[in-house]
From Swiss-Prot:
Lineage: Eukaryota, Amoebozoa, Evosea, Eumycetozoa, Dictyostelia
WD repeats, residue ranges: 163-202, 226-268, 270-307, 310-349, 357-396, 399-438, 440-478
GO biological process: mRNA export from nucleus
Pfam assignment, any one: Beta-prop_THOC3
UniProt-listed Gene3D superfamilies: YVTN repeat-like/Quinoprotein amine dehydrogenase (2.130.10.10)
Start-end of Polar residues biased regions: 126-140
Organism, as annotated: Dictyostelium discoideum (Social amoeba)
InterPro entries from the UniProt entry: G-protein_beta_WD-40_rep (IPR020472), Tex1/THOC3 (IPR040132), WD40/YVTN_repeat-like_dom_sf (IPR015943), WD40_repeat_CS (IPR019775), WD40_repeat_dom_sf (IPR036322), WD40_rpt (IPR001680)
Top-level taxon of the source organism: Eukaryota
Cellular component terms (Gene Ontology): THO complex part of transcription export complex
Stretches with biased composition (Low complexity): 106-125
Protein name: WD repeat-containing protein AAC3
Region (Disordered): 33-53, 106-140
Secretion signal, residue range per the UniProt entry: none
Length: 478
């Protein structure tokens, strides 16, 4: 027999053990076989399991507490680093602001000396009483002295000159502001030399054309002919002051060397072009077409690298950020599509994000001189300002009830000018978002601030009753 249940115990007692051994009844308190010598606590095995579970839970809680303490310490370290970075950035911004203030003060001092010298020279002139005096200086305007900014622009005059015999479509300064070009529906690009001091200088290597300019510091130097249709947009190289690209409805992009007055390259895009832009390093060009294609052109070889088709999106304008890392496209959906530029990749571009902000088609966009902000003008009459790093809209400017056609930042980033189909150009102070000055004119197709001076060039529409000149430059002080 294997075992038998003892009536006086809850335990099985082996019955075949040796006589005289150490087996005994549990109730007698004698030494028992090691198998039965363990004193079980109240509750038996369930109590042991509960103790083990409690110990495991305590260990897990301790581990979680340690992890939380570690995370809190890491977060504290990150916040401390961010705080130090913010302090460094604020210090750098303060230093840059002081440097800018010193520069502006030196400029004001120089202008004051020049003005004093001019007044002394003209004091004996009989005609000096007929010369309007403008005393407001261009400086760093803030929300506390907006009246001075308004007064400054109200004292400015406009100088105009005639070149295009048909509608002007685009106007652009070269990188150093020594040349200004305009394009027209007649398929001709016209280039003028520009000297802010009034010293005109013709290009002896080009076929000069006569100028009807009313001032002596802008003089037409050359006509560039080669397109078979209207030229919709022109763009200067940011690295070469004599290279110019033109986008025509004849389905080609032309690269011009203004110094010799000749086309040095032609690239077919297989569709009517509406916009063209150089990359900041001058190595690439992007062009968008009327049938919503984007052409990427390599400049050293002057060949097309790739043509992209965007279905369902009517492209209106294309552009680069100031670092050349992003290609942005404005479309008829009121959105801006941001693409990462990958020059060494076979695809060359990768979609990053869509910027939603307008209820109607976006016609124009432009980066500020620092590259921090992007302005976009829309058919909903709103100009939006975007922080390109965060890709968030941070500010808006209300132009009017008319669609915005062109936007441009001043050289120092203080002001933004916006034109529309109506007969005005509005100048806004960016920091305060306030309108500062209105330029009365016919509808403007294109405008652009000078790269180093507070001068605004624009191409007015031709009015049948009052034909405007091809190009006007606003911002002169007497």
């Amino acid at each position: 027999m294997g075992s038998r249940l003892n009536p006086s115990s809850n335990m099985y007692i082996p019955m075949n053990g040796p006589r005289g051994g150490y087996y005994g009844m549990p109730s007698m308190g004698q030494l028992q076989h090691p198998l039965f010598n363990y004193q079980f606590p109240p509750g038996g095995f369930q109590h042991l399991q509960q103790q083990q579970q409690q110990q495991q839970q305590q260990q897990q809680q301790q581990q979680q507490q340690q992890q939380q303490q570690t995370q809190v310490q890491q977060l504290h370290n990150q916040l401390h680093q961010q705080h130090n970075q913010q302090i460094q950035q604020q210090a750098q911004a303060t230093q840059q602001h002081l440097q800018t203030q010193q520069y502006l003060q030196s400029q004001i001092h120089q202008q004051s000396q020049q003005s004093q010298l001019s007044n002394n020279l003209n004091s004996n002139s009989k005609e000096s009483t007929n010369i309007p005096k403008t005393n407001t200086q261009y400086t760093n305007f803030d929300s506390k002295n907006l009246d001075l900014a308004s007064r400054y622009f109200s004292e400015c005059s406009t100088k105009d000159f005639i070149g295009n015999k048909k509608k002007s479509t685009s106007v652009a300064w070269n990188a150093n502001g020594t040349k200004i070009a305009s394009s027209g529906s007649d398929g001709i690009v016209r280039v003028w030399n520009f000297d802010p001091l009034g010293n005109s200088n013709n290009n002896n290597n080009s076929n000069n054309t006569s100028s009807n300019s009313k001032n002596n510091n802008i003089k037409e130097t050359i006509e560039l002919k080669g397109h078979d249709g209207s030229i919709e947009k022109i763009s200067w190289s940011p690295k070469n002051n004599d290279l110019l690209a033109s986008a025509g409805t004849d389905k080609v992009i032309k690269i011009w060397d203004v110094k010799i007055g000749k086309c040095i390259g032609t690239v077919s895009t297989n569709s009517e072009n509406i916009d063209v832009r150089w990359s900041p390093d001058g190595q690439f060009i992007v062009a968008c077409t009327r049938d919503d294609h984007l052409a990427l052109i390599d400049l050293p070889t002057i060949k097309t690298l790739k043509i992209y088709k965007f279905n369902g999106e009517e492209l209106n304008q294309v552009g680069w950020d100031n670092n050349g890392d992003l290609i942005l496209m404005a479309n008829s959906m009121g959105n801006i599509e941001a693409y990462k530029f990958l020059p060494k990749s076979t695809t060359h571009v990768k979609h990053l994000k869509t910027l939603y902000g307008h209820t109607a088609s976006i016609y124009c966009m432009e980066f500020d001189p620092t590259g921090k902000y992007l302005a976009a003008g829309s058919a909903d009459s709103i100009v939006s300002l975007w922080d390109i790093e965060d890709m968030m809209c941070v500010k808006t400017f209300i132009k009017s009830t008319f669609p915005c056609r062109s936007v441009s930042f001043s050289f120092d980033g203080q002001f933004i000018a916006a034109s529309s189909f109506e007969s005005t150009i509005e100048i806004f102070h960016i920091e305060s978002s306030q309108p500062i000055h209105t330029i009365e004119c016919s509808g403007v197709s294109s405008l652009m601030w000078h790269p180093t001076l507070p001068l605004l060039a624009y191409a007015p529409e031709i009015n049948e009753n009052n034909k405007d000149p091809s190009i006007r430059v606003f911002g002169y002080h007497s």
